[in-house]
């Protein structure tokens, strides 16, 4: 069994932390505590993200048309489906994380089951939209050949979306209890499963891009299976996997109360990136622009999952400590997360800049595409810095339960600043894809600044009181779950 997530009485950091000369010792202890969770969570997130990336790479090497179609479908399905499932699960980071900190163990399983049941009808509605994706793209002025490939790919992704409706809540169920090593083992096993399955379906069975999409679905369901087996039979989940049927309706209500703004927060952010990809299809030479911006988005997103892992670990620490009534420890966890982000962003930006002339070949054999990617590499390095900062503070928002503030911050940053700047530079200033990506950088920078201001002005004592009201008082009908 892994180490307890919450700190014991004999450890350096306690709930009565005061600004004394021992602050450096307390920070060091919290940094170690956060790092033990951040590294596995970052690895888990990278492994999960690599599944669709591998599918894009395998399909992209078949032809430029396949790459463009898959890129277009990936953009649309991310913002209309996968971001919704990921965002809704953010409610569990607040509810399950604070319930664990408050030692209200029976609530954790009930929240998780309620989330899974609530996700299924949403998947059905999204799937209907995906069935008509090709016609939608054509009506928006996209290339008919690219739209046909994209529509077929999206339909084959529907099983993957349904799997995410289960996988995301199960991931948060384990994550908020600090059970990150099982998540790590399951994610790596799934990645190793996905690679041969994708190659077999695409090349051996000759299914092309559709095979790449089906491989994602098979791999996601494989991950769901092994996660569910662990939850069912592991002694680590004995106190938390129960379900209180009488409180199902209340759990669903609370799930949507925090899940809807959490999903909005995620979808608004993701939608700017996908909107710019769609806009690139209206530029001169749309196949080149769409392919290059897709590579930039894939690279940026692949890096983003690393600080996202740090943000997930920070969310665990913040939510657990707020639930336990330790607001100053939660505040210290924020500083530790920012410190880890700075180290990670510096290293990754430097590596990308050094490899800027060659990394485009991982996605395409076209020299024209690779040269264009090299030109955009300095902007990607800046994206690494600002996106990572926002990811860490986004974890603070989910752990604290102020997703609604994060959603409004994203509206201002991306739709009032980032998107207008990107469209102006891309179309009116004829900077094409480079101008669109500058808009991304502007939006991400504004998001980070707004979240930083909100975090700096936050009353941690008030957040701890709200956590108790949310978990202990408001839902007193739940069982404690303790022996």
UniProtKB/Swiss-Prot annotation:
Keyword Membrane: yes
CDD domains on file: MATE_eukaryotic (cd13132)
Keyword Transport assigned: yes
Family matches, as InterPro entries: MATE_euk, MATE_fam
Keyword annotations of the record: Membrane, Transmembrane, Transmembrane helix, Transport
Top-level taxonomic group: Eukaryota
Pfam families: MatE (PF01554)
Compartments where found: Membrane
UniProt similarity note: Belongs to the multi antimicrobial extrusion (MATE) (TC 2.A.66.1) family.
Record's protein name: Protein DETOXIFICATION 6
Organism: Arabidopsis thaliana
Recorded name of the encoding gene: DTX6
């Amino acid at each position: 069994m892994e180490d307890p997530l919450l700190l014991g009485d004999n450890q350096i950091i306690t709930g009565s932390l005061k600004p004394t000369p021992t602050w450096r010792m307390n920070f060091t202890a919290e940094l170690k505590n956060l790092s033990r969770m951040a590294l596995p969570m970052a690895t888990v997130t990278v492994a999960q993200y690599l599944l669709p990336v591998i599918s894009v790479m395998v399909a992209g090497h078949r032809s430029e048309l396949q790459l463009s179609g898959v890129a277009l479908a990936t953009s649309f399905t991310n913002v209309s489906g996968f971001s919704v499932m990921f965002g809704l699960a953010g409610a569990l980071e607040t509810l399950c994380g604070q319930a664990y900190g408050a030692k209200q163990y029976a609530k954790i399983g009930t929240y998780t089951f309620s989330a899974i049941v609530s996700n299924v009808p949403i998947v059905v509605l999204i799937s209907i939209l995906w069935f008509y994706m090709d016609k939608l793209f054509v009506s928006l002025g996209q290339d008919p050949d690219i739209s046909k490939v994209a529509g077929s790919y999206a339909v084959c992704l529907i099983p993957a979306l349904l799997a995410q409706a289960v996988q995301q809540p199960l991931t948060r169920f384990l994550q908020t209890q600090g059970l990150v090593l099982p998540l790590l083992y399951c994610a790596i096993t799934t990645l190793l499963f996905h690679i041969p399955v994708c190659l077999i379906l695409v090349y051996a069975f000759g299914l092309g891009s559709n095979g790449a999409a089906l491989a994602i679905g098979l791999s996601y369901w494989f991950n769901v299976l092994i996660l569910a087996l662990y939850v069912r039979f592991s002694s680590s989940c004995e106190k938390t996997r129960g379900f209180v049927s009488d409180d199902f309706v209340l759990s669903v209500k609370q799930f949507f109360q925090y899940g809807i703004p959490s999903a909005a927060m995620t979808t608004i952010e993701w939608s700017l990136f996908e909107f710019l990809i769609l806009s690139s299809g209206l530029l001169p030479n749309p196949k080149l622009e769409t392919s290059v911006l897709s590579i930039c988005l894939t690279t940026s997103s692949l890096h983003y999952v690393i600080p996202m892992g740090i943000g997930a670990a920070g969310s665990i620490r913040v939510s657990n400590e707020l639930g336990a009534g330790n607001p100053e420890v939660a505040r210290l966890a924020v500083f530790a997360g920012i410190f880890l982000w700075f180290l990670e962003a510096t290293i990754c930006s430097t590596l990308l800049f050094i490899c800027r002339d060659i990394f485009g070949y991982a996605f395409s054999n076209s020299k024209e595409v690779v040269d264009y990617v090299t030109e955009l590499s300095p902007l990607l390095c800046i994206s690494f810095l600002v996106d990572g900062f926002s990811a860490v503070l986004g974890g603070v928002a989910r752990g604290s339960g102020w997703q609604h503030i994060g959603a409004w911050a994203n509206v201002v940053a991306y739709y009032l600043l980032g998107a207008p700047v990107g469209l102006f530079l891309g179309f009116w200033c004829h900077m094409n894809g480079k101008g669109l990506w500058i808009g991304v950088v502007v939006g991400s920078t504004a998001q980070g600044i707004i979240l930083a201001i909100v975090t700096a002005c936050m009353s941690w004592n008030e957040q701890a009181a709200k956590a108790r009201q949310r978990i202990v008082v408001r839902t007193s009908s739940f069982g404690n779950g303790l022996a």
